[in-house]
Amino acid sequence: MSTAPAPVAGLRWRPITAQDLTDWHGLVQAIEAADDPAERYTREDLHDELLDGSWKDPARDSTLGIDDDGVPRAFGHVQVLPGDVRTVRAFCWGGVHPQWRGRGVGRELLAWQERLGREKIAAARPTGPGRVLVNVDDGHTATERLLDRAGFRRLRVYLELTRPLDVDVPAPSLREGLRLVPYEPSLSEAVRLAHNEAFADHWGSEPRDRENWERQSVGGRYFRPTWSFVVLDGEEVAGYSLTSAYEQDWAAQGYSAGWTDLLGVRRPWRRAGVGTALLAATMRALREDGIERADLGVDVENPNRALDLYTGLGYRESRRSLAYGKDV
């Protein structure tokens, strides 16, 4: 696998270890304070990013830039999820302390991430398409310029939407034969399979295997079953909404919110009001728990006109993020 980034600005590089979590979190907090990202990371989040998953190997997947005083000043991480079948994706994440920017650190870090991403993609599947991906909040022009100069292309624009809950919330309504039920663990596998089917026509989506699903969706620490719902037609899953509470984001965004991570409707049940009923149920559950808003994200180019559904229910844009990529 790829060697560490080249020496730059006096930093020495080594993999991130579990013993680095506290110092690494301090670095991430300094970056967040400067950049005001949509997502905030707790120390536990960093532990999971580094170690939670059988496919993860921090000695291979991560790097930490240490200054002469032993203080972390930059980091990088590359992840290829198991189970990609259409396009193998390498997700790159990293950052540079605000006081260490403008010294070429980010450029070298990105070059290392691309090299490692290419190697991990080739190891996962020697033939077939792959893509190295970097997400960035809209308006971070320095990062966008860095990506442009490295040959990455802007591939997608994602909107983050918010909906206040102190105004009228519609009642869930479904045609005869469909049932809206709260999510429960016994539905996990059926919902996973429904999700893989529902998202098969979405750009950049790949099937979720059981481990990834249980660790990062319905088994995650932020997942809230009481805010999550499933629509059944007999015993078949027609649609689902899975919502989480990312409380570490609330102070920065200025309100409490439930974030709908996944909303999907299988093709035979589209245009039947299933998505509307699921979101209505979610909003009502959030309001009953005293939550101020319902939030979610959407691809501007969603093939099923999801944005029309959301705006019709009162969701409005709050911020944007961009997906940059390079096909390999």
Where are these regions (language model features)?
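A short, internal acetyl-CoA/4′-phosphopantetheine-binding micro-motif in the GNAT/acyltransferase core
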Residues: I66, Q79-L81, F91-V105, T260-R270, ...
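Conserved active-site tyrosine of GNAT-family acetyltransferases
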Residues: T143-L147, Y310, Y315
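C-terminal "cap" of GNAT-fold acetyltransferases
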Residues: L159-R179, E292-L307, L313-V328
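Glycine-rich acetyl-CoA-binding "A-motif" of GNAT/NAT acetyltransferases
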Residues: A59, D69-A74, L155, E236-G239
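Short amphipathic alpha-helix that is part of the acyltransferase structural core
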Residues: M1-L50, P172-R208
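Conserved acetyl-CoA-binding loop-helix of GNAT-fold acetyltransferases
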Residues: G102-E119, L262-V265, R271-E288, R293, ...
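A conserved beta-strand-loop-helix scaffold within acyl/acetyltransferase catalytic domains
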Residues: E32-K56, G76-V85, W203-L263
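Acyl-donor-binding surface of acyltransferase catalytic domains
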Residues: M1-P5, V80-E176, L322-K326
